[in-house]
């Protein structure tokens, strides 16, 4: 089994120290060791094109702290250059502008489906991006924003902010994180949805990285089981594409994609 060559890459101890020294400063609690190593693996997966973005939600560290963290990793020789901190609302994402633009362009071509889970309807339903014209325009806006950044890669880790006062962040993040079937809902109906007690097929994709450490959770998303037959082609295409990209790198091993059916009394998006 090919795992990270620890002789040519930073040790786990250095990766943990890089996160704790930059993301746990001041009153913020330092992330635990397991979180630090998983975050480093996710960031490397973004740099290698295995996922478009990572949404940072470990503690209250902001964009400047994440910039320091990525620069610390680069100082260790851990990352390729060109990663970007994208701030949307109060949230920070670590993205590769090149890879995320390629992904968003595919989204505009209809490679993903959306599941409307608005609380006003009795059951979830599938809809296309053409039925969500505001969202389609938003995806195009994000592409334009990120393409502008790619012209100036002089900074080791760049940063930008998008204003999002009227965005459905659940849907936007689902797209940016590379989910093949993001959820959407009408914002004027609040955060409620129609997924309570609905059987969901939960997909997870994991990859092995550091010897002796748990695998990296690369993707985790769900689709209503009742809609799964109609979404099978899109999900199969997503899996085939992920396996193809996985074969182009040698930092990770043992890609595992699995699914299980769960039913929950309430689902928070």
Curated annotation (Swiss-Prot):
It comes from Pongo abelii (Sumatran orangutan). It holds the Pfam family DUF4504. This is UPF0739 protein C1orf74 homolog. The lineage of its organism: Eukaryota, Metazoa, Chordata, Craniata, Vertebrata. It comes from the Eukaryota. Belongs to the UPF0739 family.
């Amino acid at each position: 089994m090919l795992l990270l060559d620890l002789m040519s890459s930073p040790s786990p101890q250095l990766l943990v120290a890089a996160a704790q020294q930059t993301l746990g400063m001041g009153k913020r609690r330092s992330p635990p060791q397991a979180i630090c190593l998983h975050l480093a693996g996710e960031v490397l997966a973004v740099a290698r094109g295995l996922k478009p973005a990572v949404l940072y939600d470990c503690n209250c560290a902001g964009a400047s702290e994440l910039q320091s963290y990525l620069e610390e990793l680069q100082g260790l020789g851990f990352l390729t250059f060109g990663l970007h901190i994208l701030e949307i609302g109060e949230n920070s994402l670590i993205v590769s502008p090149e890879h995320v633009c390629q992904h968003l362009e595919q989204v505009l071509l209809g490679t993903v489906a959306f599941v409307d889970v608005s609380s006003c309807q009795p059951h979830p339903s599938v809809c296309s991006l053409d039925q969500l014209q505001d969202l389609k325009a938003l995806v195009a806006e994000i592409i334009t924003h990120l393409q502008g950044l790619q012209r100036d890669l002089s900074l080791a880790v760049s940063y930008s902010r998008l204003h999002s006062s009227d965005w459905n962040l659940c849907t936007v993040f689902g797209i940016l994180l590379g989910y093949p079937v993001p959820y959407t809902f009408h914002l004027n109906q609040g955060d409620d949805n129609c997924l309570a007690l609905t059987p969901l097929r939960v997909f997870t994709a994991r990859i092995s990285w550091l010897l002796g450490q748990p695998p990296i959770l690369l993707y985790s998303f769900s689709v209503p089981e009742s809609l799964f037959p109609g979404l099978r082609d899109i999900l199969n295409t997503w899996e085939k594409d992920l396996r193809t990209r996985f074969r182009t790198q040698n930092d990770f091993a043992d890609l595992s994609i699995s699914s299980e059916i769960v039913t929950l009394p309430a689902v928070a998006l």
